[in-house]
Amino acid sequence: MNAELQTQPPSTALSALSSIPAAKPRASAPETAPTSSERHHGSRVSPNGAASVSLSVAVFDSHKYDSDPLKEACAKARQNPPPDKPPVSIELRFLESNLDVHTAALAKGCEAVCVFVNDKISEQVLQELKSLGVRLVALRCAGYNNVDLQAAKRLGIAVARVPEYSPHAIAEHAVALLLALNRKLVRATQRVRDGNFLLEGLVGFDLFGKTVGVVGTGKIGATFARIMHGFGCRLLASDPVRNEALAKELGLEYCDFPVLLEQSDIVSLHLPLTPESWHLINADSIGRLKRGATLINTGRGGLIETEALIAALKSGGVGAAGLDVYEEEEGVFFADHSGTVLTDEKLAWLLMCPNVLITAHQAFLTKEALQQLAVVTVRNLRALANGEVPGQADVDGQQWLAGF
């Protein structure tokens, strides 16, 4: 879930039921479970005597690490409603299945769906959700390139996201990838476990004094830049929306993207995926990189053209690559494939490459980030229950992407 969490404009490229496959639902009742007649905005009386409302939500692609924070946030929201608002009892229907055309019917009986980065909210899915009475798509992430927003607007389905949670989580993971690659930590650990204490092949380099190119200086990019400044690095940045305060604070130099590529020893991508930023790193741009540079991507997999990266790794044009995201990660990440043969030959090659380190889209995965994601997601769900979803004219383009 590593889309850039910036509140400024996103950086560009810098210029029926029978057809559903077997699912594994994990139903979870709220702290005080509503009866069937109380669901769908049914009213009841809370312990303090105030009238309350209820809401049923289908949570797709759920896992224990995010379902527990969601349950906790729902309980707290019910116990501590705003002074002028009734308590909201949210019933969460946890589903391990991803949301797509085959599983959309699992949301029957719910007024909202809660989705993640690998769910496919296409026009066809939205039409099915509309027919089921779903009124809100609540993204528990920042990225939304998997949602057909125009279709949602036409169908009158609201879409909300979590525009920012913990920039530190993702920025720190980018630094972790860099450090592990540079000092060959994975290889060194494997050797020691095998009883091999030799040091050949483990030589790294000092980060101090190196030039680091930060592509995208929103909240995550700025946080990453501050960390690298602490290592004593020279900082270059490329972003059409310049953060002059950041530049002054860190001595960061803004420059054109080609210049950044040519001068940087390390390039770190902190961008959302847009039509303009798709394949920002391609055969042409990667050819401009300083030879042997390290490339880090915790933004979106589609920012890098995989074939171009592989060619550059083979030629030595790219010295090392740390990837928390992958262009074809859909259907691979967030699942256990350890008992099967990996059919993606490009990914298989990258995994075997000694100077490539891949993590499975986990940069966001900290306790603090998960708590913030849950709190804002529940706030968006509560807005539906309380009749506070904005109209189309009032959509802010940040937290709310489509209204009624």
In which residue ranges do the predicted regions lie?
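A short helix->loop->beta-strand "cap" motif at the edges of active sites that frequently abuts
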Residues: S131-R135, L155-I157, C233, R291-A293, ...
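Rossmann-like dinucleotide/phosphate-binding beta-alpha-beta segment
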Residues: E200-R291
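Short glycine-/small-residue-rich Rossmann-like dinucleotide-binding loops
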Residues: V117-N118, D265, L271-L273, G299-R300, ...
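An N-terminal-biased, well-structured beta-alpha scaffold segment characteristic
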Residues: N2-V159, N282
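Rossmann-like dinucleotide-binding domain for NAD(H)/NADP(H)
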Residues: G292, G299-F404
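Short beta->alpha connector loops at strand-helix junctions that form conserved
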Residues: F116, R140-C141, I157-H168, D239, ...
